[in-house]
Structures are given as C-alpha cells and as structure tokens.
Amino acid sequence: MKKLSILAVLAASPAMAATGPFLSLSNTNFIVTLAFLIFMGILLYAKVPGRVLGMLDKRSVQIRTELEEARALREEARTILASYDRKQKEVQEQAARIVASARDEAQAAAEQAKADLRASIARRLAAAEDQIASAEAGAVRAIREQAVSVAVAAAADLLSRQMTPAAASASIDESIKEVEARFH
C-alpha cells in the first residue's frame, strides 16, 4: 500500500508546474494534492486497503471453491455421460439382438409354414388322387354293370327269339332240379 501512496504522490508531480507558489492555499493544484494525500491517509488509517484485500481474498477463495465445485460437477457430468453412452450402446446391442432374434424366429416360422403348406398340399393331393381312383373304380364298375346289363338284355333277347315255349319249360325244369341238387 505504501508503494501505491508513493505512486500517487509522484503522479501529482505535474502540479509542480503550476505558476506561483505551490504551498499557497490559492493554488488549486496544491489543494487537490493536499486533499488527495489526506484522503489517502484516511484510507490508510481506516485500514481500508487491508479490508479490500481481505474482501478480495475472500472472493478469490469463494471463486476457487466455485471452480473446484465446477470441476467436480464437470467430472460427474462426464461420468454420467459415459454411463449413458455405455447404457445406450447396451440398449442398441440389445435392440440388435432382439431384431436378429425376431428375424430368426420369423424365418423359422416361415420355414415351418412352408413345411406345413407342403404337408397340407401333399394330403390334399393324396385325397384328390384317392377321389380320382374311387371315381375311376366307380366308373369302371358302372360301365361293367351297364355292360353286364346290356349283355343280359341281349342274351335274354337272343334266347327269347331262339327259345320255343316247350324248350323254355324244359330249361326251367332243369334249372329247378339243379338248384335242388345244390341245396340238398
């Protein structure tokens, strides 16, 4: 603080350039210099520079504390950010696994559906082939029955033309005897 006072006195040296006697109360430069020195003396007596320095020291301690808190908060924020980044990576990996699993399950379900469809088509094809075979057998049977019916009708017509009433009576008697012989 003493250095500051000396500096203030030296800064007042241009007051020496004023005209007339310097130590006169009519010289404004002298009055200003004197007032400044008295003001500085009062400040020194009241220990204002010490108080100002104390306040500045307190403020610097407070600023230092706030800076340390800010550093701690920044480190905590970095830690939290790193944690969130790890969690985000884990979530992305889990989502990728879920998508891959769903894709695999969908592919397996599609394969199963294809296999079921093939089996269903094979069953329907077999059933259709069975129906076709049954229809063929029915058609063959109907044709045979029709052929037998036509043959019997033709034979009956042929026999009726060739048979006389006496020959028909003899044939009926012979058939009755043959049936009796087989049942006894």
UniProtKB/Swiss-Prot annotation:
<keyword id="KW-1133">Transmembrane helix</keyword>
<keyword id="KW-0375">Hydrogen ion transport</keyword>
<dbReference type="GO" id="GO:0005886">
    <property type="term" value="C:plasma membrane"/>
</dbReference>
<dbReference type="Pfam" id="PF00430">
    <property type="entry name" value="ATP-synt_B"/>
</dbReference>
<dbReference type="GO" id="GO:0046933">
    <property type="term" value="F:proton-transporting ATP synthase activity, rotational mechanism"/>
</dbReference>
<protein>
    <recommendedName>
        <fullName>ATP synthase subunit b 1</fullName>
    </recommendedName>
</protein>
<keyword id="KW-1003">Cell membrane</keyword>
<comment type="similarity">
    <text>Belongs to the ATPase B chain family.</text>
</comment>
<dbReference type="GO" id="GO:0046961">
    <property type="term" value="F:proton-transporting ATPase activity, rotational mechanism"/>
</dbReference>
<dbReference type="GO" id="GO:0045259">
    <property type="term" value="C:proton-transporting ATP synthase complex"/>
</dbReference>
<keyword id="KW-0997">Cell inner membrane</keyword>
<dbReference type="InterPro" id="IPR050059">
    <property type="entry name" value="ATP_synthase_B_chain"/>
</dbReference>
<comment type="function">
    <text>F(1)F(0) ATP synthase produces ATP from ADP in the presence of a proton or sodium gradient. F-type ATPases consist of two structural domains, F(1) containing the extramembraneous catalytic core and F(0) containing the membrane proton channel, linked together by a central stalk and a peripheral stalk. During catalysis, ATP synthesis in the catalytic domain of F(1) is coupled via a rotary mechanism of the central stalk subunits to proton translocation.</text>
</comment>
<comment type="function">
    <text>Component of the F(0) channel, it forms part of the peripheral stalk, linking F(1) to F(0).</text>
</comment>
<keyword id="KW-0812">Transmembrane</keyword>
<keyword id="KW-0406">Ion transport</keyword>
<feature type="transmembrane region" description="Helical">
    <location>
        <begin position="4"/>
        <end position="24"/>
    </location>
</feature>
<keyword id="KW-0813">Transport</keyword>
<keyword id="KW-0472">Membrane</keyword>
<dbReference type="InterPro" id="IPR002146">
    <property type="entry name" value="ATP_synth_b/b'su_bac/chlpt"/>
</dbReference>
<keyword id="KW-0138">CF(0)</keyword>
<comment type="subunit">
    <text>F-type ATPases have 2 components, F(1) - the catalytic core - and F(0) - the membrane proton channel. F(1) has five subunits: alpha(3), beta(3), gamma(1), delta(1), epsilon(1). F(0) has three main subunits: a(1), b(2) and c(10-14). The alpha and beta chains form an alternating ring which encloses part of the gamma chain. F(1) is attached to F(0) by a central stalk formed by the gamma and epsilon chains, while a peripheral stalk is formed by the delta and b chains.</text>
</comment>
<keyword id="KW-0066">ATP synthesis</keyword>
